[in-house]
Amino acid sequence: MSSDAIRNTEQINAAIKIIENKTERPQSSTTPIDSKASTVAAANSTATETSRDLTQYTLDDGRVVSTNRRIMNKVPAITSHVPTDEELFQPNGIPRHEFLRDHFKREGKLSAAQAARIVTLATELFSKEPNLISVPAPITVCGDIHGQYFDLLKLFEVGGDPATTSYLFLGDYVDRGSFSFECLIYLYSLKLNFNDHFWLLRGNHECKHLTSYFTFKNEMLHKYNLDIYEKCCESFNNLPLAALMNGQYLCVHGGISPELNSLQDINNLNRFREIPSHGLMCDLLWADPIEEYDEVLDKDLTEEDIVNSKTMVPHHGKMAPSRDMFVPNSVRGCSYAFTYRAACHFLQETGLLSIIRAHEAQDAGYRMYKNTKTLGFPSLLTLFSAPNYLDTYNNKAAILKYENNVMNIRQFNMTPHPYWLPDFMDVFTWSLPFVGEKVTEMLVAILNICTEDELENDTPVIEELVGTDKKLPQAGKSEATPQPATSASPKHASILDDEHRRKALRNKILAVAKVSRMYSVLREETNKVQFLKDHNSGVLPRGALSNGVKGLDEALSTFERARKHDLINEKLPPSLDELKNENKKYYEKVWQKVHEHDAKNDSK
């Protein structure tokens, strides 16, 4: 046994014997209790348990509530009903989209077989569509949804009934939000019902790589099973990549590519696969305009310059994208960021009017970029249809209604939705670090009933004190009341003499203490999940302007601050092996913090 272990054992032995010989301490005087709190305590007192109405309970604020009814009765109750096939499907096998909409609104679930059936039907339908679909006007174009089901319902209220309104969605239906499955299945059911005027494109999040890294896979494992998740990923591989709207607009999730010279290049792709990390397919789903897209860098750019621009130029003996048109996309970690010159060149070559895309959160829900020189029309338009993205951005959502050659942008705000804990944890899993930490604090408090002075090695030998009426110092006091040796019962004496029990007790307490310190670290990490939500107050901290860059960052708008902190999640996630290494490093870091905490305490 190490010297530290021996010392700790001796201290625990001394503490146990001192506790055995202490007199019962007088109860400390209590402070006056607030009259209102006294009333509440009296109302809930167990003294009147026999006559108490157990169907009524008095809260701390004095309100009396019923114990057999929901307190928040204004919030619709979650339905536990799993629909039958007759309720869910029409005689022709197509799902009843109105029933599904209302069922999901009450957080209802489907059976695994029903979910698989809808996904399989949608996959078969997508597989028959070309990479580049043609959609006529009038039409309503929508951007990212990201699992915000209740906002999706609001979108249809603003945009019009899907039964009578044509829709084109630009991808990113899943991840980040807590209702990705509901969004996906409801959109798939609308596609199955209205195939002639309802279209869905693929976004960069519609792939196994991103959904495994973000929230969709965890959601599917929590709500259903791995088989349904795999079927959803298969359906993603069948989604079309782009749309030609009214023969004038290229609609795509991400942007253009140096490899995109004609629209036929899109149809030449093999899309039935996982999204690659480079190439034309990657760029269509991942590309962004550069940050300086609207800045007047091309004021002298002529139509001839645009026509003569080259997307690919010789570089070190091989062809590479022109730096005037495409630069590596450092924000995403893959694909390219394209310039105004690149967009104008593409529109000139294809004869199109503009590019409509999604992929980036916008404070107003949309952004129109610099006009083309030839037609004076916005060369690029970004749409984002997830309001208050991540419950943090405080942004508006927008959709585009296009009819009779007129564009009409409609904005809407977020809709309240049910709350889920991060990673779909239940309340017990969420609270375990807190409970573990508090339990160990209680154990430590029990051990700390004796002062350090009482446990010092130079304290009179405990064996000499047992059986005498010698005064023992009380914890936190210079004197102690005498305690007759006869107060110790034979049972207690036998326990105190059991060396193995004392050592086992000590080892258990130290082990729990170490686990508790790990819980403490994990609790801090758990709290960081809510870090972005702390930025929602909108209040500038005192002294922010005097704190340099950090203070100025805090003075930014809610949207900009949230976007800045969430920027790391806009990148292409690491591979599975890289993720395993990151998790390994994370837990090594947790244990390192625990060991550092131990070393710090030992040095005191």
From Swiss-Prot:
Keyword Metal-binding: yes
Residues recorded as bearing Phosphothreonine in the entry: 31
Span list, region Disordered: 21-48, 470-497
Skewed-composition ranges (Low complexity): 35-48
Active site residues of this protein: 205 (proton donor)
CDD domains attached to this UniProt entry: MPP_PP2B
The keyword Cell membrane is annotated on this UniProt entry: no
Enzyme class name: hydrolase
Extent of Polar residues compositional bias: 480-489
Similarity-based family: Belongs to the PPP phosphatase family. PP-2B subfamily.
Protein name: Serine/threonine-protein phosphatase 2B catalytic subunit A2
Organism of derivation: Saccharomyces cerevisiae (strain ATCC 204508 / S288c)
